[in-house]
Amino acid sequence: MRENVKRVLVIGSGPIKIAEAAEFDYSGSQALKALKEEGIETILVNSNVATVQTSRKFADKLYMIPVTWWTVERVIEKERPDAIMIGFGGQTALNVGVDLYKKEILKKYGVKVLGTPIEGIERALSREKFRETMINVNLPVPPSLSARSEEEALEKARQIGYPVMVRVSFNLGGRGSTVAWSEEDLKRDIGRALSQSYIHEVLIEKYLHHWIELEYEVMRDKHGNSAVIACIENLDPMGVHTGESTVIAPCQTLDNKEFQDMRSMSIDVAKSIDLVGECNVQFALNPLAYEYYIIETNPRMSRSSALASKATGYPLAYVSAKLALGYELYEVLNKVSGSTCACFEPSLDYVVIKIPRWDLDKFENVEHSLATEMKSVGEVMSIGRSFEEALQKAVRMLDLGEPGIIGGKVYNSKMTKIDSLRMLKERRPYWFLYASKAFKEGATIDEVYEVTGINKFFLNKIKNLVDFYESIKNNKGLDQKTLSIAKRLGFSDYQIASAVGLSEKDIRELRQKYGIEPKVKQIDTLAGEWPAVTNYLYVTYNGTEDDIEFSNGIRKLLIVGAGGFRIGVSVEFDWGVVSLLDSASKYFDEVTIINYNPETVSTDWDIARKLYFDEISVERILDLVRKEKFNYVATFAGGQIGNTISKKLEENGVKLLGTSGHSVDIAEDREKFSRLLDKLGIKQPDWISARSIEEVRKFVEMVGYPVLVRPSYVLSGSAMRIVYNDTELVSYIKKATEISSEHPVVVSKYIDNAIEAEIDGASDGRGVYGVVLEHVEEAGVHSGDATISIPFKKLSPETVHKMKESIHSISRELNIKGPFNVQFVVKNGTPYIIEMNLRASRSMPFSSKVVGKNIIDLALTGVIKGFDFDEFVELKAKSWGVKSAQFSWAQLKGAYPFLGPEMRSTGEAASLGVDFYDALLKSWLSSSPNRLPDQKGIALVYGRSNVEYLQASARNLSEYGMTVYTLSDAPIYGYEVTSSGKSVELIKDRKVEIVVTDGYLKSLDYEVRRIAVDYNVPIILNGRLGEELTKAFLLRKSNMTFYEIGEYGAGI
């Protein structure tokens, strides 16, 4: 019997953070679809402006406001929903739901919790209650004791004996968790661990060194009917967070008894917490004896459940939402097979491998070793019919410049066996690259196992790949049989060509001559036992025939997805892909997506007519164009990855939709683009295209420091840096040329104290639609880290007119057909162009939703039909919109928090308002761990740059009612001075409510900034933002507006 509800409130997860990423865009979107199918009105609270979920196609009503209990209470008071769903927005949504329950807000308004009851959620997420629950139902857990203070934690650790694992309650991503090998370790880390717990509780647990970690995904309905959807095996052992682990499904190394015993126990765990919906249950298995423990469960959609869903084809989030409405498993249809019910457990005739993606090089002082805390910012998933094939594909998907596990930079480096084993022992990211290098240099399986704890089954497979590669490299022979084996082992044409001394084109032609072609296979959830009705596809060389027939004689488009997320490429580009899909369906008979990110909406089973879950490379796309006969390939929606390969695709005869690959190359190549601006008479900062440090030094002698070093073909400011002296210059030029060695480095004069602005737009080669965006922070802070407003606040109409004229001129010269983004710095009213991207931009979901027009849809209209004008038409907002960056400093242990031209944020949030300060305050509060500071607390304000803005910030905070302190080494005049050491103690004692600073001061305030983020204290890293935000505290603290997005005249 279905729950009798007509209006349901769904809580989203807010902006993308490390450990709480786009998997909740996918799961929340599926839940909203399931509700809509039932005719239920949906109300969504989510401040993540970048997601598809916050577009009109999913929820009936949308509140883009901070995801907190007190803001959600305002929505409940206004909308009066019958029920609430809190299992589809990560830990953020669960915490909000628990707070609403405990404060009796749900009871007050008669709101029913759908899915797992709050008491069950608490039993799962409180480490102490979970341990007690497991013991009560006779399920094995490691020796462990809970603690709520530092003294108690030290005492419990002595009772258990070192080493111990510290686990944090009501938390995700392992934030604050650690392995303590001694009391000294525990004393150092326990304060941070307790600060990261929502309920100030930790579990001190026996550390299970080198045990195998496994996960089971369980579905359960309200009557106790259960299905185990997937068993996922972590290749990395216990001690590495599961989000940091390379994982494989189905499990490979379990015997039948182990598999069945843990399967049964996972169902018992679900029963013990009264699960309704989906959970994942984590186990530790002793590799040397038949011994295992239950580690934890997550009673919600999670990173693992998103992976399991994409790996098996089983729509977990959709089914979970149906179960939360009261359906039983047998009543829910599996829409992938179209004929089986949700109680059928999936069966796989392929293997899936997930590898995380890290961006640790962007952060100073960060710990690079993998451990109990998540640091990865994204992940990729590959599908193959052998471990070797899937692993090689996954490595290429990481987009690190590695052609596979073998034959790349690490494999061909001068690293010795000892060096490789050291990197493995230190648990550096991408361990498989160092393992293959170690085997190449003569390491044994036992030696690699000793330092990694990785099962020898997997190590043997990697060593076999090394042995095969070395054999063809040494023999230089490539007959039909050898080439066929190489392709079945996952080697790319490039890898094979490098081994035997031929070109990639030679290998492609040889393959086609021998008839060695990849086969298209279909994911049906039941290993071919039932036919599938959806085209959820992958490509393999381990097959003899295609599972599908290819349609001809119709208009077909292939859209290139965004690939794995990283800093600079996140869910906003998936929004671009899905927006293009929706728009293209009006003009094409069959629209197909190729992508390999398990977190995204674009890789859902029911989004595209066809989905290729496969690698994005020139080789793969040429294979698919040969089979499918696509009329066009669209590379502009998914960010940088498509732009990077567009020119090569065009050179190989592929017809690109929109702007030509030649024009894209001009815009992406800093030197070519700078020459174009000179030709058109458009202002830009003084620049030089340099191929040597000597050339740069001559340029610097003319223009003076500081200068900006900018390599070509990069995203999110990779290797981009403001340099202030010769020492920094030598260091950064070296780094930049390593990133883009085929292209010269452009060095430009850095214009300080300038306003930065952008225009998002679409063109048909003549007419232009555009939205003007303005940064709060001065130029020099990467646009992805900046606070951005629509409409502009500081720019003059005359300056904006010049910006529009420049863009109109460029769009005609390059014949831009599609979306674009242009960035300007403005000094004394004069705009200078610093960058142009001929693709969807990071800010496009924000600009589209604020002005109420989908720029991707406009762009495709321009490409297909053209516009009926030849001018710049500005798209204007009816209210104010502000976008704020979400940083994940707390997850990146040791990293020094500061802003610069290289991007470091992991996500973004936005809000709308009746004025700038209304929108700004809500937007900032939407990013974690930001909160309104307690007026009785201390504010710490200091810095050596933007001092006048810091002075204003201190003045505003003082007027707000706070006690303002400043650092003796970088003081703000007129306020009580304190030392760095004293400031650290004040933060640890939880007396500091907010820190406002500016610039790069690592030598004097590293510990202050680091302790602030470790103890969840909001930190503002720019003086100009500090002044505006503290003014917002004064103006808008008690009168923020909380309207539905349509009431602001916004939304798409």
UniProtKB/Swiss-Prot annotation:
Pfam families named in the record: CPSase_L_D2 (PF02786), CPSase_L_D3 (PF02787)
SMART domains: CPSase_L_D3
Protein residues bound to Mn(2+) 4: 835, 837
Residue numbers binding Mg(2+) 3: 823, 835
Positions of Mn(2+) 3 binding: 823, 835
Entry domain remark: The large subunit is composed of 2 ATP-grasp domains that are involved in binding the 2 ATP molecules needed for carbamoyl phosphate synthesis. The N-terminal ATP-grasp domain (referred to as the carboxyphosphate synthetic component) catalyzes the ATP-dependent phosphorylation of hydrogencarbonate to carboxyphosphate and the subsequent nucleophilic attack by ammonia to form a carbamate intermediate.
Every MGS-like domain range: 930-1052
Name this protein carries in UniProt: Carbamoyl phosphate synthase large chain
Residues engaged in binding Mn(2+) 1: 282, 296
Record-listed ATP 2 binding positions: 710, 749, 751, 756, 780-783, 823, 835
Pathway field: Amino-acid biosynthesis; L-arginine biosynthesis; carbamoyl phosphate from bicarbonate: step 1/1; Pyrimidine metabolism; UMP biosynthesis via de novo pathway; (S)-dihydroorotate from bicarbonate: step 1/3
Catalysed reaction, written as an equation: hydrogencarbonate + L-glutamine + 2 ATP + H2O = carbamoyl phosphate + L-glutamate + 2 ADP + phosphate + 2 H(+)
Disulfide bonds: none
Organism (species): Sulfolobus acidocaldarius (strain ATCC 33909 / DSM 639 / JCM 8929 / NBRC 15157 / NCIMB 11770)
Region spans: Allosteric domain: 931-1052
Role this protein plays: Large subunit of the glutamine-dependent carbamoyl phosphate synthetase (CPSase). CPSase catalyzes the formation of carbamoyl phosphate from the ammonia moiety of glutamine, carbonate, and phosphate donated by ATP, constituting the first step of 2 biosynthetic pathways, one leading to arginine and/or urea and the other to pyrimidine nucleotides.
Cofactor: Mg(2+); Mn(2+)
